[in-house]
Curated annotation (Swiss-Prot):
Coiled coil: none annotated. InterPro entries: Proline-rich_CW_protein (IPR051308). Keywords: Nodulation, Signal. Residues 71-110, 196-210, 294-306, 422-435, 532-558 have a biased composition (Pro residues). This is Early nodule-specific protein 2. The gene is ENOD2. It comes from Medicago truncatula. The keyword DNA repair does not apply. The keyword Cell inner membrane does not apply. Induction: Accumulates in response to Sinorhizobium meliloti inoculation leading to nodulation. GO terms for biological process: nodulation. Belongs to the nodulin 75 family.
Amino acid sequence: MKCQRIEDDFTLKFYVFLLINTCSSIPFLFITTRGMASMHSLAILLLGVVMLTTPVLAEYYKPPTYEPPIEKPPIYEPPPTEEPPPVYKPPIIHPPPNYKPPAHTPPIYHPPHEKPPPVYEPPYEKPPHEEPPREYQPPRENPSPEYEPPHHGKPPYENPPPEYKPPYEKPPPEYQPPHHEKPPPEYQPPHEKPPPEYTPPYEKPPPEYQPPHEKPPHESSPPEYQPPHEKPPHEHPPPEYQPPHEKPPHEHPPPEYQPPHEKPPHVHPPPEYQPPHEHPPPEYQPPHEKPPHVHPPPEYQPPYLKPPHEKSPYEPPPQEYQPPHEKPPQMKPPSEYQPPHEKPPHEHPPPEYQPPHVHPPPEHQPPHENPPHENPPPEYQPPHEKPPHYEHPPPENQPPHVHPPPEYKPPHEKPPHEHPPPEYQPPQENPPPEYKPPHEKPPHENTPPTHHPPHEKPPQEISLPEYQPPPPSTKYQPPHEKSPHENPPPEFAPPHKKLPPNYNPPRHEKPMPKYQPPHEKLPPVYKSPYVKTPPPQAYHPPPPIYHHPPFHPPPHVKPPVYETPLAKVPQMKKPTRYNTRPFGHYPPYKKNQ
């Protein structure tokens, strides 16, 4: 609607402008045409102006038609580029400098210093931690399995009778005379401490070879019989001199060798001894000596003189006389008479009698019976035995492993899971109570203090009980069943008699100094007795010596890629919108114009 109105206004203005120009040109035309005989041309001109302006004036009374507004899309105007794009300037690449040899005389060539070849040192093998070399254990060859019939019944497990140990009987107390009969004290010489004996440092014994433990199926060894623990009487013996404790390094008993659990079906054969792969010492390669770049004087080459080409005069061979070739006359033999070929009449022989083809009766084919599908017994494949990984194999070579021929193994029948009968535990026998006599306070006597050596905690030693199998000849002793109210009568203990006091030297006597053993440096603790040998180092020749300075090409400079500056994305202006025209009102209300 807006565009249409603008076009109508433009047309109206054009016609008004044409009318004004026409009216202004009337006097000029009148002047130019006054010499005419008539005003006929002026009337025609005025009539044309009226006819041109009449339609425009007539459209004023035409009611306008409403046309909905047309939203004209905004015209995109690119943002003004204030700064012109930068002009690409290629980088200045300087040409490489031409090598100019030095003006002075070339230096005297000194051959390069030849470094003596490195002395091959065998790989250092750290000896094990004071362990003798392991003895070669020959491979354990399993005997050929014998056929065992299927186990139908398991006999009851009979524990061997435990060895009977009589209960500990406390010896009767010795008679102590009464306290009032005190014998005269005997003279006790001064106690001289003997010098402590030197205890050598603890040396760990080499571990003994323990054969691989093969656990039988569901059969546990009978537990060791543990006698009842009887606490000895609480008697303090006189203190003995305890030298200062020197804690050895890790004084734990050597752990028992526990080989890896070998599964019965997977028994790996002993591997063949593979000697350690020792790289041969690298051969000495002398350094490559480039001779000095000195051109030797050219040898004198005499000018090549082409020998004179002595061409002997060509003497053609004498030609022999060839008589003229006379072709003999071609004599054709007289042609023989050929009688005319007469084709015999086409006579077919009489056909032979062919008896009718009689098919013989079909032979009886018995029904095809597939033989029973009998799989042949599978061949015994011995289990794949992976050789154990020895970091340091035994020093001696092993004999070649000979696989025994496989024998038939019957199907394994698992015996019934029977728990062994519980082992008999004898009742705990408490020792009889000790009678403690009444405490009699001795007379108050000031005795000099006794010197007690410093208490040093003994090392904690872990001892493992050794398995002692019960003797086969012991007879089973039934447990002693204690009858009710069978307490033994209390033993009579006489009154406590004070022992004569020990002689204590007077205070002015200085005690003997303690023996301090020399400080021994503990041996270093090795993490592993085996040390990986370092690989031999390869010989690297020295770098070559250049007699001319090397030519290094200039670095490759990649020209920058010109990219136009990223123009800002134009923000689309919000199109002009009009309010909803109220019904019955004209013209519409313009909002954003």
